[in-house]
């Protein structure tokens, strides 16, 4: 058996991977094992009771985390006229149309979120091969294709996260940083879980929230007792 590193050994001593922890205890343990020299992200994985092979059971959307993400977000907006001005006033970092498209085609992708007004999709649609693989393609399901670009910009800046089920029916999302307090992380997790509950597909049968686990970038992961979510 391979010898555990000091970090892994310390984590294994503190977190029992076979145990289900109440949500507050799980978050506390994950924070305590996030000992890297940078502010590690705190991530959650949620196993949903869906059939990911069926298109009518895929879960996708976005939610604004009440305590934010702890990350500075750069936002690019495809808009023109009054909508472009509204986007700038809301705090967008880059606003344009054909010029922004050329910038992206040239490989200058220095932003984290792309928002588009519906009337610009004729231009944005041609960028699918560039933006799609990076998870940046605007989509109405997550609120990034909208006539209200100003609100979309404010949401992105305020800590909005996008989520979608992977091929195994699991949602992966960041709910904050190791520097956050347990209550902040718990509030963000509750907001995400609430959004997932509201996005439950009508065709999904049986238990919907099957498994939850939280982890940090370099630290340990702890499984959460699902029932403890509603108890808080």
UniProtKB/Swiss-Prot annotation:
PROSITE patterns: RIBOSOMAL_L1
Gene Ontology terms, MF aspect: rRNA binding; structural constituent of ribosome; tRNA binding
Record-linked Gene3D superfamilies: 3.30.190.20, 3.40.50.790
Biological process according to GO: regulation of translation; translation
Superkingdom of origin: Bacteria
Keywords annotated in UniProt: Repressor, Ribonucleoprotein, Ribosomal protein, RNA-binding, rRNA-binding, Translation regulation, tRNA-binding
Cellular component terms (Gene Ontology): cytosolic large ribosomal subunit
Subunit structure: Part of the 50S ribosomal subunit.
Function, in words: Binds directly to 23S rRNA. The L1 stalk is quite mobile in the ribosome, and is involved in E site tRNA release. Protein L1 is also a translational repressor protein, it controls the translation of the L11 operon by binding to its mRNA.
NCBIfam families: rplA_bact
Family in the record: Belongs to the universal ribosomal protein uL1 family.
Protein name listed in UniProt: Large ribosomal subunit protein uL1
Originating species: Bordetella petrii (strain ATCC BAA-461 / DSM 12804 / CCUG 43448)
